[in-house]
Every structure is written in structure tokens, then in C-alpha cells.
């Protein structure tokens, strides 16, 4: 899927991009959330909070259970609240159990490391790999919740030894994922008696997280006392079927107190903040000290974080434990998403690619196709299906669709721009296009006219003239000669011809502070007249003849001024261990370390 789709994306969007049966559904999930955010319409509401004093001079903060959507209603509640006599309606208490979570799988480890430690999924897997290589944890690419019998006995003994018998509660966890392969155990320490291990800080932190979760998984539930206090001006609940304009919603608050810590002894950070409430009784009078109303707006659904995307991929059956981190890295490396704080935000390129695939290949990037393909691969691995037959059933129709969609126009042409925006050069209308740096407005007459604006209609800063004539097309008749201009490109500033794209001359020489070429003073060995000069290319700095394009001699590193004793070519700078080597790749002295052997 990926190979064929990627080739099509190169033609329809841009070379170097990619698509696939796992990365494309992941990008689609992010785009679906982005569309929800764009379509979201915020609504106003008011939060009303009151501060009260009890008979015993204790302070109590209560909030209105309803959030009025109109300011007039909020003002009505405030008015009645200020003039009424408040009483406690009721005090409800119940004991609740907080059960521990199962031991870690790959996805849950990545999620916990993200929320607790701020690690990306990729970083989590790198650190986990180091712990595994040191023999400190079990294999870290797993979707199983099972723990071996011997390890289970060791964990239970360690719980009893560390915390006491009352904290031990043996548990067995069933894997809920339909696609779980369960080839390995859950992620756990290999020696549970080691509460701390690892060579570096990040290893120590991740190991501690794994140790805590493993221990907690075999411990008793925590017991929490949950209290709810409600009050109103009349001493009677009026939250249901209010008929009188003098009635207002109940004001309430809740509190939580841990009465038995259970597994929280092993994982104290999971305890959370406890809220202890003052002792009050039903019917007790309370005195309003202050009441406030704060206007707010509903918020759109949040963008996925890396941990959130991993959770969603696992939930939908997309990918495997070994691929979650790689999926996120791929869509980031391709420029499909960028970080907005800790959230993943699709870029213009990601949006265009996803829209193109959703419109033309929806059946191959949806959840069901990906999950079914995972099932097919499992069946092939288990001998239930034949590889060739499964491939033929899928590939025939798919290859026909690829061929048919090859005739579509480029996906980077995004339609007409707002008519109010005209080309800053010729005054023609403009169209929306996708460039390397995102969406922009381009003149309809491109390439005859290179006028452009930013996506919001602002005029772009055009190329700056250098005052020099282009060495390639400068011999043309007056009026057709190109001039050298300075442009801003993906790899920084460069000099090119103003007649682009008719003339594709590019001077990649770097300049010094006074604007002259950075030459080395070393003669070009090929043309004998030019000097070796520093230039900037796609892969960084290199050195070429100052007579370019007449002479195209170039080498990778800065020449030293010496000549090779073996072949006579220029010697160039090497590395710390080999400070100098021959610039000719065919010469044995190009890799002098091999000569020493």
C-alpha cells in the first residue's frame, strides 16, 4: 500500500513525502479532530461560586450545579443568593474503591511516560531498550498483560515484604485487545526486589515507573471516602422542576479522603489531591460571605498529544506495539504534523495529503481496512491463510485504482483565492497553492508572472536585486537579459536568475561580511584560473570553483592547499583522527585509515 501510494503522492503533492496503511490512518485521525476544532462554535456560560462560613467558623466553598447560558439568568441567581438564608440540604458520604491498573504494555507505558515524565513515545522506547539490554526489564514491545508464574510469585512476596500482608491482593489480568499477539509478558522488572535501577537519570525514572506499576498491579484497592455537600437558600432542593422565579439551583461541593491507601503505597503520585471538607449537618445554617459569577466559553475538543494518539491507535486496532513510536516519528519527519505545546497539529502539507487520500483512497486508509489487514497478516503467520491468495485479492483492485488516479491534477492546486486579493505584480487574480512552507497565494499567470502573497493576503517580500547580470542568459538581447537576485529558500539565502523558471541559474556561493565570495586562495586544479570557494548546497557546505558554472569542479570539504602524494589531487580537511585526506574518492588516500591496516 505504502509504496504505491507514496509514488502517487510524490507526483500529486511533493517529492519525498509518503503514505501507508498505518501512517495515513494516523494522520487522518489527527485531521478529523482538526476539522472538529474548526467546526466548533463556542457557547457562553457562567460559573457561579459562593464562599460560606459554617456555625463553627469553618469556610466552605460551594458552586452552582447549573451553568446558566445567559447573563440575565446568572444575575438572577446572584440576586436571590445574596438575599436568601442558606441551609445545608444534605451530606452524602460513601466509600469507593480505586483499583490498580494492569501492568504495562507498550502503549500504556508510552502513555504513562508521556503524562508522568514528559517523554515522547520514541524516547520512551529508546530508554526502555537500554533497560532491556541491561537485563533490568522484560521485553518492551508487547501487547500482553500476562506475567509468568515465577515472576508473579516474586512480585507478591515483595509486596508482602515491603508493605505488609494486608496490602497484598493477587490479580490476573485479561488482555482486552482483539489483535493482541501476546508473544511476550507484560513489561516488568526482571528482579522486582530492585526498587531502583538504571545507569542514567532517564533510565532510573522509567524503571521506577515500571516497578511502581508492576507492584501496584498485585496490591489491594485503595479505599476513598467521598463526601458531597449541597445547600440552597430555602433549605429545600430546587434543582428539579423549578417553578417560582425566586428559586435557584442547588450549590454543591465534593471532597475525597483516602482512608486506606492500598496500591497507592507503591505509586504515591497516583494518589492525587485530597480535598477535606468541614463537618456540617443537614439543616445547619451557613452564612454567605461572598459570591461571584465568571463568564466563560465552551472549548473545542483538544488536539491529540503523542500519548493520546498512541491510545487512539491501539483502541482502533491500528499498528502494533513495535510501530506506535515509529508512526508518530514518520508523520513528524514528513512534515505532516508539528508540535503545538504538547499537542500534535496537522500542517498545511499534512492536511493536503490527508484530504487527497481521504477523497481518492478512503477505503485503504480507514480503520477497518487497517485492522482487517492486521488480522490477515496474523492468519498468514498462523497458517490459516495463503500469502499469495490474500495479496492477489487486495492488490488487483488497488493497483487499478492507483493507475486511474494517476490522471488527477496536482493536489497542491487548492482552488481560487478570495477575489479581493490581486497579484502584486500584474494585478491578475490569484489561486491558493501549497508550497514547502505551507499554503500561499500565487498569481494565476504563473510561471509567466511570479507574483505571490501570504495565505492571509499580505504581500510577500520579493527577491532583492544584486545589480549583476546573470552569467547564463546575460548575453541575450536587451530586455530579455536576466538579473541576479537574492532569494530565500529552504536552505537559506541564495542567488539565482530573475528569469526563473526560464533560466535556472543558481549561485550557491556563500558571501563574507562585505558581500564578496568566500574564496580560499587555493587555485582550482581543473580550470587553473578560478579559486576554490565556499558554497552552500542541499546537504550543507561544500567547496567549488569560483568560475562556476563554466567550471563545475567541487569537493566535499575545505581544501588544505596540499596535493595528494599518491594521485596529485587536492587534499581536504578530514576528521579529528584523520585530519587530512585526498579529495578524489577513487584514490586509496581518500580513506587513509584503510591504508594503515
Annotate each language-model stretch with its function.
Residues 1-93, 185-233, 247-252:
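Phosphate-backbone binding and catalysis cores of DNA-processing enzymes
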Residues 6, 39, 121, 140-235, ...:
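Basic, low-complexity terminal or inter-domain segments flanking catalytic cores
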Residues 83-99, 290-296:
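Positively charged, polyanion-binding regions of nucleic-acid-associated proteins
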Residues 88-91, 100-113, 138-142, 300-312:
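Short acidic, hydrophobic short linear motifs in intrinsically disordered regions
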Amino acid at each position: 500500500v505504502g509504496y504505491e501510494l507514496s509514488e502517487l503522492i510524490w507526483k500529486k503533492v511533493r517529492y519525498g513525502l509518503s503514505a501507508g496503511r498505518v501512517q495515513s490512518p494516523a494522520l487522518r485521525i489527527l485531521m478529523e479532530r482538526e476539522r472538529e476544532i474548526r467546526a466548533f462554535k463556542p457557547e457562553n456560560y457562567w460559573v457561579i461560586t459562593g464562599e460560606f462560613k459554617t456555625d463553627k467558623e469553618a469556610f466552605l466553598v460551594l458552586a452552582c450545579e447549573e451553568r446558566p447560558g445567559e447573563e440575565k439568568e446568572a444575575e438572577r441567581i446572584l440576586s436571590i443568593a445574596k438575599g436568601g438564608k442558606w441551609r445545608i440540604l444534605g451530606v452524602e458520604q460513601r466509600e469507593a474503591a480505586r483499583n490498580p491498573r494492569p501492568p504495562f504494555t507498550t502503549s500504556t507505558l508510552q502513555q504513562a511516560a508521556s503524562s508522568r515524565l514528559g517523554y515522547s513515545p520514541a524516547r520512551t522506547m529508546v530508554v526502555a531498550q537500554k533497560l532491556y539490554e541491561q537485563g533490568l526489564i522484560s521485553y518492551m514491545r508487547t501487547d500482553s498483560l500476562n506475567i509468568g508464574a515465577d515472576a508473579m510469585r516474586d512480585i507478591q512476596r515483595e509486596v508482602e515484604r515491603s508493605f505488609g500482608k494486608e496490602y497484598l491482593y493477587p490479580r490476573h489480568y485479561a488482555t482486552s485487545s482483539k489483535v493482541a499477539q501476546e508473544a511476550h509478558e507484560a513489561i516488568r522488572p526482571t528482579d522486582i526486589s530492585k526498587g531502583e535501577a538504571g545507569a542514567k537519570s532517564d533510565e532510573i525514572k522509567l524503571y521506577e515507573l515500571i516497578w511502581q506499576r508492576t507492584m501496584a498491579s498485585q496490591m489491594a484497592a485503595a479505599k476513598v471516602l467521598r463526601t458531597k455537600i449541597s445547600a440552597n437558600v430555602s433549605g429545600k432542593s430546587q434543582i428539579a422542576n423549578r417553578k417560582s422565579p425566586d428559586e435557584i439551583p442547588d450549590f454543591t461541593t465534593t471532597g475525597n479522603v483516602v482512608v486506606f491507601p492500598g496500591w497507592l503505597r507503591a505509586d504515591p503520585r497516583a494518589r492525587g489531591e485530597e480535598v477535606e471538607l468541614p463537618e456540617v449537618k443537614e439543616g445547619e445554617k451557613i452564612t454567605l460571605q461572598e459570591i461571584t459569577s465568571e463568564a466563560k466559553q465552551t472549548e473545542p475538543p483538544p488536539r491529540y498529544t503523542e500519548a493520546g494518539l498512541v491510545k487512539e491507535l491501539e483502541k482502533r486496532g491500528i499498528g502494533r506495539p513495535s510501530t506506535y513510536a515509529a508512526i508518530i516519528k514518520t508523520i513528524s519527519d514528513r512534515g505532516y504534523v508539528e508540535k503545538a505545546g504538547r499537542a500534535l497539529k496537522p500542517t498545511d502539507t499534512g492536511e493536503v495529503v490527508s484530504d487527497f487520500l481521504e477523497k481518492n483512497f478512503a477505503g485503504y486508509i480507514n480503520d477497518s481496512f487497517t485492522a482487517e489487514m492486521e488480522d490477515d497478516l496474523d492468519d498468514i503467520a498462523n497458517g490459516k491463510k495463503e500469502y499469495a491468495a490474500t495479496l492477489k485479492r487486495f492488490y488487483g483492485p488497488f493497483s487499478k485504482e492507483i493507475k486511474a488516479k494517476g490522471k488527477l491534477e496536482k493536489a497542491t492546486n487548492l482552488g481560487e483565492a478570495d477575489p479581493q486579493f490581486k497579484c502584486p505584480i500584474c494585478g491578475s487574480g490569484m489561486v491558493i497553492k501549497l508550497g514547502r512552507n505551507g499554503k500561499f497565494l500565487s498569481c494565476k499567470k504563473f510561471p509567466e508572472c511570479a507574483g505571490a502573497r501570504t495565505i492571509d493576503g499580505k504581500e510577500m517580500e520579493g527577491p532583492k536585486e544584486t545589480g549583476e547580470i546573470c552569467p547564463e542568459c546575460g548575453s541575450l538581447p536587451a530586455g530579455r537579459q536576466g538579473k541576479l537576485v537574492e532569494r530565500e529558500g529552504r536552505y537559506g539565502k541564495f542567488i539565482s536568475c530573475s528569469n526563473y523558471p526560464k533560466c535556472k541559474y543558481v549561485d550557491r556561493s556563500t558571501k563574507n561580511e562585505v558581500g564578496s565570495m568566500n574564496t580560499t586562495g587555493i587555485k582550482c586544479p581543473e580550470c587553473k584560473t578560478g579559486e576554490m570557494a565556499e558554497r552552500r548546497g542541499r546537504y550543507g557546505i561544500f567547496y567549488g570553483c569560483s568560475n562556476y558554472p563554466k567550471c563545475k569542479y567541487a569537493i566535499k570539504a575545505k581544501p588544505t592547499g596540499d596535493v595528494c602524494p599518491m594521485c596529485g589531487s587536492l587534499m581536504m580537511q578530514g576528521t579529528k583522527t584523520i585530519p587530512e585526506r585526498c579529495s578524489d574518492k577513487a584514490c586509496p588516500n581518500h580513506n587513509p585509515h584503510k591504508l594503515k591496516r
